[in-house]
């Protein structure tokens, strides 16, 4: 009897689970980076499947900045309680003491200190030799050329010219002390794949992904939501209520909403089939400077 042919999503799922299991077996101290977004939620679901009925054998790490949406933090804590995984959180103490924020210091400095440096601090503190990330190759041009096993030096820097071949899904995880590998199990997934898998598997998400009436201010052609009293308005700016949703999530002053009526997974998938805009057009950190993402990754950003 001929074997049943796997669907496209089943093939992606099997590949990702194999990568997750390989890392858990090969590395001494792996960690899964948990940004609370849709890709992280899919990656968490895959990790749970990979080791079911046992628990995930490595911790999840959230690098906080102090500026995430309140709904993201509430969702993070609820997921940790529901599934019982080990959750580590880290916020850059020096940046916190200096009061680094995206309004007074700009997106580039805020991202470097609170995200990149904060991540490197956490990786050094716990001595992780492998870190899972939810990045996908279709997201952005610098991520398109990143390996599944992305080698990082002792300073957590990425050199695109110093990467290893990955033939026939064979990965090289050899590292010296202090070096590490960033692992991207979702490399071959697309944004549409992610949404279709979320629908298929009934994966919970932060409600911000779904359209609803929200208070936003238009700034530089982008819609920024007021998430707390720290939101600063420029002269002439005022809040207005709009039906919007978020296609991607991050620090709320640096993450733009989009007009949308998609308040269900079915409607979001339909919207994805018709859209011609970039997924990350709402991430203000990507427009800091030319080739911004690649420069951030060279400095240690995930």
Swiss-Prot record:
**Where do the record's region annotations for Disordered lie?**
280-302
What the entry lists under SUPFAM superfamilies is as follows: Adenine nucleotide alpha hydrolases-like (SSF52402)
EC nos: 2.7.7.4
Per the record, what are the reactions this protein catalyses?
A: sulfate + ATP + H(+) = adenosine 5'-phosphosulfate + diphosphate
Task: Supply the InterPro entries for this chain.
Answer: PAPS_reduct_dom, Rossmann-like_a/b/a_fold, SO4_adenylTrfase_ssu, Sulfate_adenylyltrnsfr_sub2
* Reported function: With CysN forms the ATP sulfurylase (ATPS) that catalyzes the adenylation of sulfate producing adenosine 5'-phosphosulfate (APS) and diphosphate, the first enzymatic step in sulfur assimilation pathway. APS synthesis involves the formation of a high-energy phosphoric-sulfuric acid anhydride bond driven by GTP hydrolysis by CysN coupled to ATP hydrolysis by CysD.
**Record's protein name:** Sulfate adenylyltransferase subunit 2
């Amino acid at each position: 009897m001929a074997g049943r042919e796997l669907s496209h999503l089943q093939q992606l799922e099997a590949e990702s689970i194999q990568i997750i299991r390989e890392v858990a077996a090969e590395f001494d101290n792996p960690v899964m980076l948990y940004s609370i977004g849709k890709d992280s939620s899919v990656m968490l679901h895959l990790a749970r499947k990979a080791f079911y009925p046992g628990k995930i054998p490595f911790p999840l790490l959230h690098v906080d900045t102090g500026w995430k949406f309140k709904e993201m933090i509430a969702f993070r804590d609820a997921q940790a309680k529901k599934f019982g995984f080990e959750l580590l959180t880290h916020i850059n103490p020096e940046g916190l003491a200096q009061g680094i924020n995206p309004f007074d210091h700009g997106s580039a400095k805020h991202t470097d200190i609170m995200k990149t440096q904060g991540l490197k601090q956490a990786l050094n503190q716990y001595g992780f030799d492998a870190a899972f990330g939810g990045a996908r190759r279709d997201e952005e041009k610098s991520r398109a050329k990143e390996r599944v096993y992305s080698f990082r030096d002792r300073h957590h820097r990425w050199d695109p010219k110093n990467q290893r071949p990955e033939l026939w899904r064979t990965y090289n995880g050899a590292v010296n002390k202090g070096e590490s590998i960033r692992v991207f199990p979702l490399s071959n997934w697309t944004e549409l794949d992610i949404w279709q898998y979320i629908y298929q598997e009934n994966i919970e998400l932060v409600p911000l992904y779904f359209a609803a009436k929200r208070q936003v201010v238009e700034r530089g052609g982008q819609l920024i939501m007021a998430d707390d009293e720290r939101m600063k308005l420029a002269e002439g700016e005022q809040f207005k209520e709009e039906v919007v949703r978020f296609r991607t999530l991050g620090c709320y002053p640096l993450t733009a909403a989009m007009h949308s009526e998609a308040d269900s997974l079915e409607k979001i998938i339909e919207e994805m089939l018709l859209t011609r805009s970039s997924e990350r057009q709402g991430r203000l950190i990507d427009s800091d400077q030319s080739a911004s993402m690649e420069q951030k990754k060279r400095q240690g950003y995930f």
